[in-house]
Amino acid sequence: MSIQHFRVALIPFFAAFCLPVFAHPETLVKVKDAEDQLGARVGYIELDLNSGKILESFRPEERFPMMSTFKVLLCGAVLSRVDAGQEQLGRRIHYSQNDLVEYSPVTEKHLTDGMTVRELCSAAITMSDNTAANLLLTTIGGPKELTAFLHNMGDHVTRLDRWEPELNEAIPNDERDTTMPAAMATTLRKLLTGELLTLASRQQLIDWMEADKVAGPLLRSALPAGWFIADKSGAGERGSRGIIAALGPDGKPSRIVVIYTTGSQATMDERNRQIAEIGASLIKHW
């Protein structure tokens, strides 16, 4: 067993022997301040990774656009098919120029040779490549099948209805392509620590998230040296922004954090800054 596999296998073990965790309302004060600064709703939840206990939450059962955070769930569904012998990570998928959609920095470079399922998941999570996500959605049967996968996990809230990039439209009061912070946090925890996926697939999923290259201005910008984070960000229309993450000190994750916002007129930089400040408060009061 590799060191990384050992780390993920012992996530519940280490967490069980940690000192009790206590909620700190100071972080919620910052979440509410972010709402004021952005002029928009902000949803927040913080779960203990081992027990699933909610440590703090704000608007945990209000719907927010998922945006690209759905790509972690998508690759979880792909990995479940791999575990069941219905898919192979090494299978190569070929596609054409007509398949390319807006923001496809990886797939646009491989029109000639195609990409493997493993490479597509890596591109979808680490670079948020939209064509990679659409190609992977095709392998599982489309958005409705991802929703069905989530329902089978016990998540009857999260739903995907459309493809990239239309799913980022974020129309107010439109339930399409949305989740709730509580539902997303619980589902992410199941994917990373539950028995739904094999140990190898859980490790692969967290490795992809740990290698995320496009979430630097968010929670990662607030992390002290030595902290662990595996995350996936999302951005959408109407001032929408979000991030889902597993993080913790001492090089291992111990909490799940989900943050979503929508309806702001603020710039992307300002949305990023507010999420980073929430992260800084979380870490300060850990």
Curated annotation (Swiss-Prot):
UniProt entry tagged with the keyword Protein transport = no
Instruction: Enumerate the Pfam families for this protein.
Output: Beta-lactamase2
- Please list the GO terms describing molecular function: beta-lactamase activity
PROSITE patterns on file:
BETA_LACTAMASE_A (PS00146)
Task: Give the intrachain disulfide bonds.
Answer: 75-121
Q: Which reaction does it catalyse?
A: a beta-lactam + H2O = a substituted beta-amino acid
Signal sequence: where?
1-23
Signal in keyword set: yes
Q: Which UniProt keywords apply?
A: Antibiotic resistance, Disulfide bond, Hydrolase, Plasmid, Signal, Transposable element
The enzyme's E.C. designation: 3.5.2.6
Q: List the active-site residues.
A: 68 (acyl-ester intermediate), 166 (proton acceptor)
| Protein origin, superkingdom | Bacteria
Say how it is used.
Answer: This protein is used as a marker in many commonly used cloning vectors, such as pBR322 and the pUC series.
Instruction: Give one GO biological process term.
Output: beta-lactam antibiotic catabolic process
Q: What is the effect of changing residue 235 to T?
A: In TEM-5 and TEM-24
Q: Which NCBIfam families match?
A: bla_class_A, blaTEM
Q: What does this protein do?
A: TEM-type are the most prevalent beta-lactamases in enterobacteria; they hydrolyze the beta-lactam bond in susceptible beta-lactam antibiotics, thus conferring resistance to penicillins and cephalosporins. TEM-3 and TEM-4 are capable of hydrolyzing cefotaxime and ceftazidime. TEM-5 is capable of hydrolyzing ceftazidime. TEM-6 is capable of hydrolyzing ceftazidime and aztreonam. TEM-8/CAZ-2, TEM-16/CAZ-7 and TEM-24/CAZ-6 are markedly active against ceftazidime. IRT-4 shows resistance to beta-lactamase inhibitors.
Q: Further notes on this entry?
A: The beta-lactamase present on pBR322 was cloned from plasmid R1 (R7268).
Q: What's the family?
A: Belongs to the class-A beta-lactamase family.
In Swiss-Prot or TrEMBL terms, this protein is called Beta-lactamase TEM
User: From which source organism is this entry?
Assistant: Escherichia coli
